[in-house]
Amino acid sequence: MLPFPAPPTTEQQATLDALRAEVAAIRAMQDSQWVDARRAEAVRATVRDALADVGTRTSFLQDAGTCGYDHGTFVRSSDGNWLFRAGILQQQRFVAAFAPAAKGVPDQNMWGFDVHRFNLTLSGHAIDPSITWNMTGAWNSQPDRFVTEGGKFRLLYGLVRKDWGEGWSTIVGLHNVPWDLESDFFGSSRLTTGEYSVFNYRFGMGKHEGISMLWEGTDVRMKAGTYSQLNQASLVWDNPVNLSWAVAARVEAKVGADWEQLSWLSSRPGDRPGLVAGLGFVWSTGRADNPPDTRAAQGFTVDLRAALGGTTLIAQYALERDAVGLPDLQWSSGLNLQASTFLTDVVEPFASGSWMQDAGVPWILQAGFNWYVAGQNTLKLTTKVVVPLGTGEINGQTNISGGLGIMPSGNGCGIVSQLQLLY
């Protein structure tokens, strides 16, 4: 017979069943822990992938640069070496000009609305922040001192500037000729008396193509350059009116207010007080082999500006040959006195008187106020009265009447109300 083990007793069977149950429980627990470990590893892998994706997306965002608004809409590279900015200037106005005529002759009174000026400014820096550029196109409703044809889009500024450090820089292209007080200002958006200074309208050198050097220190700055022309439009190298030689220079010294604050003609309430003295010089020779005969601007100008924390006082004098405000080519002197003060944080009355020797209308007076609706010139309403003291021809050698808002001759006065948007 084969030996067979005796069947387990009841007590032994109970012990075996308990052991089997315990082993099954241990196996189930181990299986659960293994699954949890696999799940944890899967979660960790998902988190790692998500973090890597976020890092990649962030790096793409950094490479794409930033955009926003700062004196115009801008796009800047992540390293700061490239910047593109776009801005606009709009000047909408109502003008009423009165010219009383002799008895029995109808008065020459005119009035109406127009979009006086629209500027599109593109600017920025390239390669690195020391190389800046500016391209400004301008549309004017009618001819004036600086625009020979109205109703056309033309180049107003086109320049490249290189900063060499230690305050030195070079400017090449179409830019302001260093001469009088208004030479420091970009366009007309920062002037107190609206769109023009009468003094600069008559004696100014304008904007011309050339090359200039600029040095700016804490309290002194100087700019000097050579140009194709000085006081009439010339945008090409072979223009018959180009001068044989044309140089201009300006030096300024100040105490008090910093240069950035002085880049706005009006001193605002709360600004640091300051005093600025300026001296400008121009010299040129006509080009006899290029008919017709060209003007040869020569002369000097001095000016003094007191910025008194809400009040601004200005005095200017010029002695100039062949100024555009004269009826003939000759020497003439001129004077401008101007004052403005803030009655509130947003309302600024102003008055000015400009005199020009031997002009058809020697004196031109202005008085009015600025209402800064929003920001520092962002949205500004200028309303003024322009009063020529005299009834002679006011155009001089160029069409200045339309820009000033008065008739060419027989003037009584002009009323100008202009809304400016600077974006």
Where are these regions (language model features)?
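N-terminal periplasmic/intermembrane-space "pro-region" immediately following the signal or transit peptide
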Residues: M1-Q91, K103, W259-L262, Q418, ...
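A broadly tuned "polar low-complexity/structure-edge" signature
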Residues: V43-T46, L51, L83, F94, ...
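Generic anion/oxyanion-binding catalytic loop in active/binding sites
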Residues: P8, N109, L404
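Outer-membrane beta-barrel pore domains
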Residues: A99, P106, R145-F146, L159-D163, ...
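Outer membrane beta-barrel
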Residues: G68-Q232, N239-W259, L265-P273, W331-F350, ...
